[in-house]
Amino acid sequence: MSPKKILLVAHDVTLAHLGRPLQLAGYLHAAGHDVTLAASSDSARFLYNFPGRTHTLAPTGKARFIENLAKGRPVFDFETLKRFAEEDEKLLAHYRPDVVIGDFRISLSASARRQQVPYATITNAYWSPDLAPRFIVPDLPMVRFLG
């Protein structure tokens, strides 16, 4: 397979949303692909050893995201999503990747379609209906008492 130009976009409102694309980007770079990883400046300290190219996104509004999530409100308002989409489209137009892979960048699916760039997303397995989790009950006295 010939090397591909791959853009990964980490919407790093939590460390997991950076860690997954960072790990995947490292594997793809080691496999010989031209990899760019985009994340906010809040994540710069985690990217200094990344061997590929990096791109700094506008701040993601972590504090507001966490507050909205905790209060059961929509995590992003329309204006924020619009701003993300505009940034996505500029990013895609600039790098023109063969594929873009996002982690919690909600706007990226629509932006990639508008720019005609194939899109994939990184999702935790526990969000899949195909996962049948096996819960192990710890062997504690309270468990024996309650059953």
Pin down the residues of each PLM region.
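Conserved nucleotide-sugar phosphate-binding/catalytic loop shared by glycosyltransferases and other
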Residues: 3, 12, 30-80
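Residues that mark the start of a beta-strand
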Residues: 5-7
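Conserved nucleotide-sugar donor-binding subdomain of glycosyltransferases
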Residues: 68-107
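An aromatic- and histidine-rich active-site surface loop
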Residues: 43, 100-115
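Gly/Ala-rich phosphate-binding loop of Rossmann-like dinucleotide-binding domains
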Residues: 25, 29, 113
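Active-site-proximal region of nucleotide-activated glycan assembly enzymes
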Residues: 118-147
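A short, glycine/small-residue-rich beta-strand->loop->alpha-helix junction that serves as a flexible
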Residues: 10-22
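Hydrophobic/aromatic beta-strand patches that form the interior of the parallel beta-sheet core
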Residues: 38, 55, 101, 120-122
